[in-house]
C-alpha cells in the first residue's frame, strides 16, 4: 500500500517532501518505495536511501548492479538503514549482493565494475538521529530533515578501486 495523506504523519511528511522539492522525484519516489517496504518513515531509512542513491551516482550503476557491505549490524534502529539501501541500490539479501557486518556504524561500501565507494554518515548526523526526540516533534519530521540535506552535510566518502 502506498502512503497517502490518510496514512497520518508518514503521509504528511511525504507530501511535504514533494512540496518542498526535497531533491527531485527520484529521491521522493525511492523514499515512498522504501516506506512501503520498511513499514514506516524514519531517519535511518531515509539515510539508507540517500546512501544507495549516492553510490549509484558515484559508480554509475543501475539498481542491482552493485554489491554492498553494510556495517550497521542487525540491531534497529541503525539497521533500518539496510532497508533504505536495499530499495535504493537494489542490493538485497535475496540476490546475495548485500552483506551485513558489525560493528554497528552507519557505513556502507559499494562496489561495481572495478570501482568502490565507501560512504559513512557523519557522527553528528547519527547523533542527531539517535536523539530525535529531543530535536523533533516526530520520527517523520526527523526523516524529512534528513531528506533535505546535501550529501556533503550527511556523509563523508572515499573512492577507490573495487
Where are the language model's segments positioned?
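Non-transmembrane, aqueous-exposed alpha-helical and coiled segments at domain scale
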Residues: 2-162
